[in-house]
Amino acid sequence: MLYNLRQELLAGIRAATSDAGYDYEVDQSAIELEDITDEEKGEFSSPISFSIAAAAGAPPVDVAAAIADAHRSNGLPAEVEAVTVEGGHINYHADTTDLADATLSTILRDGSEYGTRTDADPDTILADVSSPNIAKPLHVGHLRNTILSDAVMNILEARGHDVTRDNHLGDWGVQFGNLMHEYTEFGDEATLEDDAIEHLLDLYQQFEQRDSMLADLEDDETVTDQFADAVTEERDYHADSGKEWFTRLEQGDEDATALWERFRTVSIDRFKQTYDDLDVAFDVWNGESFYAQEGWNDVIIEKAIENDVAMRGEGESVYIPVYPDDYENVGDPQAADVDASLDRARQMREANDDLEDADFDPFYIVKSDGSTLYGTRDLATIEYRIEEYDADQSVYVVANEQNQYFQQLFVAARKMGYNDIKLKHIDYGLISLPEGSMSTRKGQIITAREVLDRAQDRAEEIIAEKGRIDDAEAQSVATKIALATIKYEMVAAKRERDTTFDIDESVALEGDTGPYVQYAATRGYSILDGADAAPEIDDLDPSVFNDTDVELLFELARYPLVLERCEERYDAAPLAHYLLQLAHVFNSFYHKNAVLDAENARTERLLLTKATTQIFDNGLGLLGIDVLEEM
């Protein structure tokens, strides 16, 4: 109800601003939702007068009064009983009776659809989600990506968009040539059969550690020239062999392809076990290899050269120049403005012998040895999504370490002529456990499986301490509590910031945790189970509400606005924070109020409780968290 009311107020204040004589473009920020406990401000307020006052040459309070008068004259929405001006703010006060009738009837009528939206012309969104590298285990960082992206895509679908989740596997590149070299030189068939991912990870780390050690020796001024030459020869042998294996793979060599396919298959099998435990699924698994093997990479290279947006560099390399002034608003198809001409780049190349001295960044699509890069494959992905899906948006849930890369990718895409698609990098900060941060290359991986198992163990301990659940159900309940813990923490933390995830603190029924929200929902079900029969909305009498009842009602009415904010920000954190706040308000509601034993408001409070449990169901469901009817 508040969502629809805000839209009405927005339209009304646009008209009132014009009628009051002010030439000002009113946007969504003109109407703000306020704290229900602040009676002076009302449910909605507008600070628009402060933006208009300077140009109008009038005090904000006078501007606000003029707009408020015009809005009254034009007619206020039926749900608004008064409009006031306080300190330059225009405040709209909702009628509690109308708010209660509209909100509770809508929630109970719409059920699981409350807060969703049907769009007659939805955006087709293709999303890179999870996207692990094969031949390595999923680690705690993949948990954040997988859980965050699942929640965001759930919300975008709930808001009416057509979303395709693409687990864009990292399954192509010279690193897999290195791995094939290492396996053929040092791998063990029996060990691969016993624990494929662990063995492949060991080999990957062995290659990296040896290369790093040899590089250090090359730079060591204390060694003899003869020894340094031997070190260089040894290092080149392994590196060249890895490059050769990848070249063979790109050329479709039978042995290289068979070995790569084996690595890929065992990796996906292991990934699926964890995804099943997380209750997360994907629509497609178009890894980087898809675009190489299906010829999409070739399309990109040919198109870039034919359209004269790419330059040839050293050896066989090809790159698209990215100028400093290309970046602004590059993800927005309406606002992006890039220079696709090569004239500036050619002039810079003529003036500078060294490419690094030129005032542009080369976005490589072919390396000097003729092989492709992930930039090639990412451009191929955009081409494919436009051609095969007619995509309106291509979004990427990837850690913020890659912010600069994605800006360059988007510039390159615009220069390639992909001008009608929205390009969005949904970045997030790194996550660590108190023991320290993870690093694949240093061999300090904290696997997703370890995190899941530790959360499960802690949840089982809590259940045993409480002693409320039958042994037959304890493990299942513990699993849902463990998942609630992990999923809530992964989405509630400020998305762009690095965060530390303390499992022992987070697996708790108190505090700002997923299980705390779960427990509030369970309490709601317990109250409803104690009622003789479900109340009917026709019996609602909002006049019996006290302040605590109204505060809960207001929280329920906010839910669609929260989903709108999540959609605008491509972020599930506002929903996680809202559900926590709803849990706090609901806990206050049933502690301060009698519900089942209420003398005058039993029906009304049962309706509030029923609506609250529905929103817990809906909101937690979007986060991928199960509601428990018993904890």
Swiss-Prot record:
UniProt-listed InterPro entries: aa-tRNA-synth_I_CS, Arg-tRNA-ligase, Arg-tRNA-synth_N, Arg-tRNA-synth_N_sf, ArgRS_core, DALR_anticod-bd, Rossmann-like_a/b/a_fold, tRNAsynth_Ia_anticodon-bd
Checking PROSITE patterns in the record gives: AA_TRNA_LIGASE_I
The organism is: Halobacterium salinarum (strain ATCC 700922 / JCM 11081 / NRC-1) (Halobacterium halobium)
In which compartments does the protein localize? Cytoplasm
Q: What is this protein called?
A: Arginine--tRNA ligase
CDD domains associated with the record: ArgRS_core
UniProt main location, coarse: cytoplasm
Q: Which domain of life is it from?
A: Archaea
Among HAMAP family, the record links this protein to: Arg_tRNA_synth (MF_00123)
